[in-house]
Amino acid sequence: MLGLIDRLTRPLLRALDPEDAHALTLRALKYAPLPRPAADDARLAVRAFGLDFPNPLGIAAGFDKHAEAPDALLRLGFGFVEVGTITPRPQPGNPRPRLFRLDADEGVINRFGFSSEGEAGGLARLSARARHGGIVGVNVGANRDSADRGADYVRLIETLAPVASYVVVNVSSPNTPGLRELQEAAALDDLLARVLAARERVAQRVGARPILLKIAPDLSLPALDDVVAVARRRRVDGIIVCNTTITRPKGLRDAKARETGGLSGKPLFPLATRMLAETFVRVENAFPLIGVGGIDSGAAALAKLRAGARLIQLYSALVFRGLGLVAEIKADIARAIDQAGGTLADLVGLDAAAVTAQPWPE
Protein backbone atom coordinates (compact mmCIF):
# COMPACT_ATOMS: atom_id res chain seq x y z
CA MET A 1 0.00 0.00 0.00
CA LEU A 2 2.71 2.48 1.00
CA GLY A 3 4.72 1.51 -2.05
CA LEU A 4 1.78 2.32 -4.31
CA ILE A 5 1.28 5.68 -2.60
CA ASP A 6 4.97 6.44 -3.10
CA ARG A 7 4.87 5.62 -6.80
CA LEU A 8 1.82 7.79 -7.35
CA THR A 9 2.83 10.82 -5.31
CA ARG A 10 6.61 11.10 -5.41
CA PRO A 11 6.84 12.51 -8.96
CA LEU A 12 4.37 15.24 -7.99
CA LEU A 13 6.14 16.04 -4.75
CA ARG A 14 9.55 16.17 -6.43
CA ALA A 15 8.19 18.81 -8.82
CA LEU A 16 7.32 21.12 -5.91
CA ASP A 17 9.52 23.39 -3.85
CA PRO A 18 11.08 21.09 -1.20
CA GLU A 19 9.54 22.92 1.76
CA ASP A 20 6.10 22.97 0.12
CA ALA A 21 6.41 19.27 -0.72
CA HIS A 22 7.30 18.48 2.88
CA ALA A 23 4.36 20.45 4.24
CA LEU A 24 2.00 18.66 1.84
CA THR A 25 3.39 15.26 2.84
CA LEU A 26 2.96 16.00 6.53
CA ARG A 27 -0.59 17.23 6.00
CA ALA A 28 -1.46 14.11 4.01
CA LEU A 29 -0.05 11.83 6.71
CA LYS A 30 -1.92 13.74 9.39
CA TYR A 31 -5.30 13.16 7.77
CA ALA A 32 -4.81 9.89 5.89
CA PRO A 33 -6.68 6.87 7.34
CA LEU A 34 -3.53 4.82 7.79
CA PRO A 35 -4.05 1.33 9.23
CA ARG A 36 -2.11 0.24 12.26
CA PRO A 37 1.03 -1.65 11.22
CA ALA A 38 1.46 -5.32 11.93
CA ALA A 39 3.13 -6.10 15.23
CA ASP A 40 6.90 -5.94 15.03
CA ASP A 41 9.09 -9.01 15.19
CA ALA A 42 9.80 -9.48 18.90
CA ARG A 43 13.52 -9.77 18.15
CA LEU A 44 13.55 -6.10 17.12
CA ALA A 45 12.48 -4.87 20.57
CA VAL A 46 14.94 -2.58 22.36
CA ARG A 47 15.16 -1.49 25.98
CA ALA A 48 16.82 1.92 26.33
CA PHE A 49 16.53 4.96 28.63
CA GLY A 50 14.07 2.96 30.74
CA LEU A 51 11.70 2.71 27.75
CA ASP A 52 10.60 -0.29 25.70
CA PHE A 53 10.87 0.36 21.96
CA PRO A 54 9.03 -2.07 19.62
CA ASN A 55 11.82 -1.70 17.07
CA PRO A 56 15.03 0.36 16.86
CA LEU A 57 14.06 2.61 13.92
CA GLY A 58 12.79 6.11 14.63
CA ILE A 59 12.16 9.25 12.63
CA ALA A 60 14.52 12.08 13.45
CA ALA A 61 13.61 15.56 14.61
CA GLY A 62 12.92 17.98 11.79
CA PHE A 63 10.33 15.93 9.96
CA ASP A 64 7.49 16.88 12.32
CA LYS A 65 8.68 20.18 13.73
CA HIS A 66 5.41 21.19 15.37
CA ALA A 67 4.21 17.79 16.66
CA GLU A 68 1.40 17.67 14.10
CA ALA A 69 1.42 13.99 13.14
CA PRO A 70 3.37 11.76 15.56
CA ASP A 71 0.65 9.10 15.65
CA ALA A 72 0.51 8.89 11.86
CA LEU A 73 4.27 8.40 11.81
CA LEU A 74 4.03 5.62 14.37
CA ARG A 75 1.45 3.93 12.14
CA LEU A 76 4.02 3.91 9.33
CA GLY A 77 5.97 1.39 11.41
CA PHE A 78 8.51 3.56 13.19
CA GLY A 79 9.44 2.35 16.66
CA PHE A 80 9.49 5.91 17.94
CA VAL A 81 9.04 9.48 16.75
CA GLU A 82 11.00 12.57 17.69
CA VAL A 83 9.17 15.86 17.14
CA GLY A 84 10.65 19.37 17.06
CA THR A 85 12.83 21.26 17.35
CA ILE A 86 10.46 23.29 19.56
CA THR A 87 11.51 26.66 21.00
CA PRO A 88 9.87 28.50 23.91
CA ARG A 89 8.52 31.38 21.83
CA PRO A 90 7.38 31.25 18.21
CA GLN A 91 10.02 32.27 15.69
CA PRO A 92 9.95 32.19 11.88
CA GLY A 93 13.46 30.90 11.34
CA ASN A 94 15.52 31.95 8.35
CA PRO A 95 14.03 33.33 5.11
CA ARG A 96 13.04 30.98 2.30
CA PRO A 97 14.39 29.23 0.34
CA ARG A 98 15.95 27.28 3.18
CA LEU A 99 15.58 23.63 2.16
CA PHE A 100 17.42 22.13 -0.81
CA ARG A 101 17.39 18.64 -2.33
CA LEU A 102 20.72 17.47 -3.69
CA ASP A 103 19.26 14.96 -6.13
CA ALA A 104 22.61 13.98 -7.62
CA ASP A 105 23.97 13.12 -4.17
CA GLU A 106 20.81 11.98 -2.33
CA GLY A 107 21.47 14.67 0.24
CA VAL A 108 19.58 17.57 1.76
CA ILE A 109 20.75 20.98 2.94
CA ASN A 110 18.63 22.97 5.35
CA ARG A 111 19.02 26.31 7.04
CA PHE A 112 15.66 26.55 8.81
CA GLY A 113 17.12 28.11 11.95
CA PHE A 114 14.71 26.50 14.44
CA SER A 115 11.51 27.67 12.74
CA SER A 116 8.97 26.92 15.46
CA GLU A 117 5.42 27.68 16.49
CA GLY A 118 6.62 27.77 20.10
CA GLU A 119 5.93 25.62 23.11
CA ALA A 120 2.21 26.40 23.45
CA GLY A 121 1.19 24.66 20.23
CA GLY A 122 3.46 21.70 20.84
CA LEU A 123 2.20 21.31 24.38
CA ALA A 124 -1.44 21.36 23.27
CA ARG A 125 -0.94 18.77 20.54
CA LEU A 126 1.21 16.45 22.63
CA SER A 127 -1.22 16.66 25.55
CA ALA A 128 -4.11 15.76 23.25
CA ARG A 129 -2.39 12.64 21.90
CA ALA A 130 -0.83 11.41 25.16
CA ARG A 131 -3.50 8.73 25.68
CA HIS A 132 -2.61 7.12 22.34
CA GLY A 133 0.62 5.60 23.65
CA GLY A 134 3.75 5.01 21.62
CA ILE A 135 7.15 6.57 22.22
CA VAL A 136 7.25 10.24 21.20
CA GLY A 137 10.33 12.24 22.12
CA VAL A 138 10.59 16.02 21.99
CA ASN A 139 13.63 17.86 20.64
CA VAL A 140 14.01 21.32 22.21
CA GLY A 141 16.10 24.37 21.39
CA ALA A 142 16.69 27.95 22.42
CA ASN A 143 15.20 31.00 20.74
CA ARG A 144 17.61 32.80 18.44
CA ASP A 145 17.32 36.10 20.34
CA SER A 146 17.34 34.65 23.84
CA ALA A 147 19.50 36.46 26.39
CA ASP A 148 19.79 33.27 28.47
CA ARG A 149 19.65 30.16 26.34
CA GLY A 150 20.03 27.91 29.35
CA ALA A 151 16.83 29.37 30.76
CA ASP A 152 15.07 28.47 27.49
CA TYR A 153 16.03 24.81 27.86
CA VAL A 154 14.96 24.78 31.52
CA ARG A 155 11.60 26.28 30.59
CA LEU A 156 11.06 23.69 27.87
CA ILE A 157 11.94 20.81 30.19
CA GLU A 158 9.45 22.07 32.74
CA THR A 159 6.73 22.58 30.13
CA LEU A 160 7.15 19.70 27.69
CA ALA A 161 8.77 16.86 29.63
CA PRO A 162 5.43 15.88 31.21
CA VAL A 163 4.00 15.14 27.74
CA ALA A 164 7.16 13.58 26.26
CA SER A 165 8.58 10.06 26.39
CA TYR A 166 12.06 11.64 26.39
CA VAL A 167 13.52 15.11 25.80
CA VAL A 168 16.48 15.95 23.56
CA VAL A 169 18.64 18.98 24.36
CA ASN A 170 19.64 20.19 20.91
CA VAL A 171 22.83 22.25 21.10
CA SER A 172 24.15 21.23 17.70
CA SER A 173 22.07 22.87 14.98
CA PRO A 174 24.42 24.85 12.73
CA ASN A 175 21.71 27.33 11.73
CA THR A 176 21.33 29.27 15.00
CA PRO A 177 24.35 31.55 15.52
CA GLY A 178 26.35 30.65 18.60
CA LEU A 179 24.29 27.60 19.53
CA ARG A 180 27.10 25.10 19.02
CA GLU A 181 29.19 27.01 21.57
CA LEU A 182 26.98 25.31 24.18
CA GLN A 183 28.91 22.11 23.39
CA GLU A 184 32.05 23.62 24.94
CA ALA A 185 32.88 21.93 28.24
CA ALA A 186 32.14 24.71 30.74
CA ALA A 187 29.00 25.90 28.95
CA LEU A 188 27.72 22.34 28.52
CA ASP A 189 28.37 21.49 32.14
CA ASP A 190 26.37 24.51 33.30
CA LEU A 191 23.56 23.81 30.84
CA LEU A 192 23.20 20.15 31.79
CA ALA A 193 23.28 20.98 35.49
CA ARG A 194 20.35 23.36 35.00
CA VAL A 195 18.45 21.03 32.68
CA LEU A 196 18.81 18.00 34.92
CA ALA A 197 17.76 20.01 37.97
CA ALA A 198 14.64 21.01 36.04
CA ARG A 199 14.07 17.34 35.15
CA GLU A 200 14.16 16.45 38.86
CA ARG A 201 11.57 19.10 39.65
CA VAL A 202 9.31 17.71 36.94
CA ALA A 203 9.90 14.15 38.19
CA GLN A 204 8.32 15.01 41.51
CA ARG A 205 5.05 15.63 39.66
CA VAL A 206 4.99 13.19 36.75
CA GLY A 207 7.99 10.89 37.10
CA ALA A 208 11.43 11.16 35.56
CA ARG A 209 11.85 11.67 31.84
CA PRO A 210 15.05 10.64 30.03
CA ILE A 211 17.23 13.57 28.93
CA LEU A 212 19.35 13.08 25.81
CA LEU A 213 21.97 15.33 24.25
CA LYS A 214 22.23 15.81 20.48
CA ILE A 215 25.73 16.63 19.24
CA ALA A 216 27.32 17.86 16.03
CA PRO A 217 29.37 15.71 13.64
CA ASP A 218 31.89 18.54 13.28
CA LEU A 219 33.37 18.30 16.78
CA SER A 220 37.10 17.71 17.00
CA LEU A 221 38.05 14.57 18.89
CA PRO A 222 39.36 16.57 21.88
CA ALA A 223 36.04 18.44 21.93
CA LEU A 224 34.20 15.11 21.77
CA ASP A 225 36.28 13.93 24.74
CA ASP A 226 35.01 16.94 26.68
CA VAL A 227 31.38 16.45 25.63
CA VAL A 228 31.36 12.80 26.64
CA ALA A 229 33.15 13.52 29.91
CA VAL A 230 30.57 16.16 30.85
CA ALA A 231 27.67 13.97 29.75
CA ARG A 232 28.93 11.07 31.83
CA ARG A 233 29.64 13.23 34.86
CA ARG A 234 26.20 14.82 34.72
CA ARG A 235 24.61 11.42 34.01
CA VAL A 236 22.53 12.20 30.97
CA ASP A 237 20.50 9.27 29.73
CA GLY A 238 21.91 9.15 26.21
CA ILE A 239 23.49 10.96 23.27
CA ILE A 240 22.20 11.32 19.72
CA VAL A 241 24.99 11.20 17.15
CA CYS A 242 24.57 13.38 15.19
CA ASN A 243 23.11 16.57 13.71
CA THR A 244 23.79 17.94 10.22
CA THR A 245 27.28 18.96 9.10
CA ILE A 246 28.56 22.31 7.88
CA THR A 247 31.35 20.53 6.01
CA ARG A 248 31.01 19.37 2.40
CA PRO A 249 32.49 15.94 1.67
CA LYS A 250 34.59 15.48 -1.43
CA GLY A 251 32.79 14.30 -4.53
CA LEU A 252 29.47 16.13 -4.18
CA ARG A 253 28.03 16.61 -7.66
CA ASP A 254 24.90 18.67 -7.17
CA ALA A 255 25.24 22.42 -7.79
CA LYS A 256 23.09 23.09 -4.72
CA ALA A 257 25.87 21.66 -2.53
CA ARG A 258 27.20 25.23 -2.39
CA GLU A 259 24.16 26.38 -0.41
CA THR A 260 24.74 27.45 3.20
CA GLY A 261 23.30 25.23 5.91
CA GLY A 262 23.51 21.79 7.45
CA LEU A 263 24.02 18.80 5.15
CA SER A 264 22.17 15.55 5.81
CA GLY A 265 21.38 12.42 3.86
CA LYS A 266 23.70 9.95 2.16
CA PRO A 267 26.77 12.26 2.01
CA LEU A 268 26.70 12.59 5.81
CA PHE A 269 26.83 8.84 6.44
CA PRO A 270 30.64 8.30 6.60
CA LEU A 271 31.29 11.21 8.97
CA ALA A 272 28.23 10.55 11.14
CA THR A 273 29.08 6.86 11.48
CA ARG A 274 32.69 7.63 12.37
CA MET A 275 31.55 10.09 15.04
CA LEU A 276 29.11 7.49 16.35
CA ALA A 277 31.88 4.92 16.75
CA GLU A 278 34.19 7.48 18.36
CA THR A 279 31.44 8.36 20.82
CA PHE A 280 30.69 4.70 21.56
CA VAL A 281 34.26 3.88 22.56
CA ARG A 282 34.37 6.95 24.83
CA VAL A 283 31.00 6.32 26.48
CA GLU A 284 32.02 2.78 27.52
CA ASN A 285 28.39 1.64 27.79
CA ALA A 286 27.55 4.30 30.39
CA PHE A 287 24.37 5.04 28.42
CA PRO A 288 22.85 4.17 25.03
CA LEU A 289 23.43 6.06 21.78
CA ILE A 290 21.05 6.89 18.96
CA GLY A 291 22.73 6.86 15.56
CA VAL A 292 21.45 9.18 12.85
CA GLY A 293 22.88 10.54 9.63
CA GLY A 294 22.66 9.05 6.16
CA ILE A 295 20.70 5.84 6.84
CA ASP A 296 19.11 4.90 3.51
CA SER A 297 19.06 1.09 3.52
CA GLY A 298 19.14 -1.96 5.72
CA ALA A 299 22.90 -2.18 5.24
CA ALA A 300 23.37 1.40 6.40
CA ALA A 301 21.12 0.80 9.41
CA LEU A 302 23.13 -2.27 10.38
CA ALA A 303 26.38 -0.32 10.01
CA LYS A 304 25.06 2.22 12.51
CA LEU A 305 24.11 -0.51 14.97
CA ARG A 306 27.48 -2.19 14.61
CA ALA A 307 29.21 1.18 15.07
CA GLY A 308 27.55 1.58 18.45
CA ALA A 309 23.93 2.70 18.12
CA ARG A 310 21.30 0.96 20.20
CA LEU A 311 18.62 2.91 18.32
CA ILE A 312 18.70 4.59 14.93
CA GLN A 313 16.86 7.41 13.18
CA LEU A 314 16.37 8.56 9.61
CA TYR A 315 14.67 11.40 7.77
CA SER A 316 16.35 12.55 4.53
CA ALA A 317 16.25 9.10 2.93
CA LEU A 318 12.45 9.20 2.88
CA VAL A 319 12.73 11.97 0.27
CA PHE A 320 14.66 9.70 -2.08
CA ARG A 321 13.60 6.16 -1.10
CA GLY A 322 10.02 6.61 0.06
CA LEU A 323 7.96 5.29 2.94
CA GLY A 324 8.52 1.65 2.03
CA LEU A 325 12.05 2.04 3.37
CA VAL A 326 10.78 1.65 6.94
CA ALA A 327 9.61 -1.94 6.47
CA GLU A 328 12.64 -2.75 4.32
CA ILE A 329 15.10 -1.71 7.03
CA LYS A 330 13.29 -3.61 9.77
CA ALA A 331 13.22 -6.76 7.63
CA ASP A 332 16.94 -6.46 6.88
CA ILE A 333 17.77 -6.09 10.58
CA ALA A 334 15.70 -9.17 11.42
CA ARG A 335 17.54 -11.14 8.72
CA ALA A 336 20.89 -10.03 10.11
CA ILE A 337 19.88 -11.25 13.57
CA ASP A 338 18.95 -14.62 12.04
CA GLN A 339 22.26 -14.88 10.22
CA ALA A 340 24.29 -13.94 13.30
CA GLY A 341 22.36 -16.38 15.46
CA GLY A 342 22.15 -13.98 18.39
CA THR A 343 20.15 -10.94 19.44
CA LEU A 344 19.92 -7.35 18.31
CA ALA A 345 21.90 -6.29 21.36
CA ASP A 346 24.75 -8.55 20.24
CA LEU A 347 25.24 -6.42 17.11
CA VAL A 348 25.62 -3.10 18.91
CA GLY A 349 29.18 -1.79 18.76
CA LEU A 350 30.70 -4.88 17.14
CA ASP A 351 32.55 -2.78 14.55
CA ALA A 352 33.18 0.37 16.61
CA ALA A 353 36.89 -0.24 17.14
CA ALA A 354 37.40 -1.10 13.47
CA VAL A 355 35.54 2.03 12.35
CA THR A 356 37.69 4.27 14.55
CA ALA A 357 40.84 2.70 13.08
CA GLN A 358 39.95 3.71 9.52
CA PRO A 359 41.21 6.90 7.81
CA TRP A 360 39.10 9.96 8.63
CA PRO A 361 36.25 10.47 6.11
CA GLU A 362 36.94 13.19 3.55
Listing of model-derived features with the role each one plays in the protein:
Residues 3-46, 110-115, 120:
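An N-cap/entry alpha-helix motif that binds or orients negatively charged groups
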Residues 26, 30-32, 37-39, 174-187, ...:
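Glycine/Thr-rich beta-alpha phosphate-binding loop at enzyme active sites
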Residues 51-58, 132-140, 201-219, 281-291:
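Short beta-strand/loop segments at the ligand-binding rim of alpha/beta enzyme cores
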Residues 66-73, 154, 219-233, 281-285, ...:
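Catalytic cores of alpha/beta
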Residues 80-91, 171-173, 238-248, 301-330:
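Glycine-rich phosphate-binding active-site loops on the catalytic face of alpha/beta enzymes
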Residues 84-133:
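A gly/proline- and charged-residue-enriched helix-loop-helix capping module
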Residues 90-106, 249-261, 318-342:
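C-terminal helical cap(s) of enzyme catalytic domains, especially alpha/beta-barrels
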Residues 142-154, 181, 187, 213-233:
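Active-site glycine- and acidic-residue-rich loops that bind
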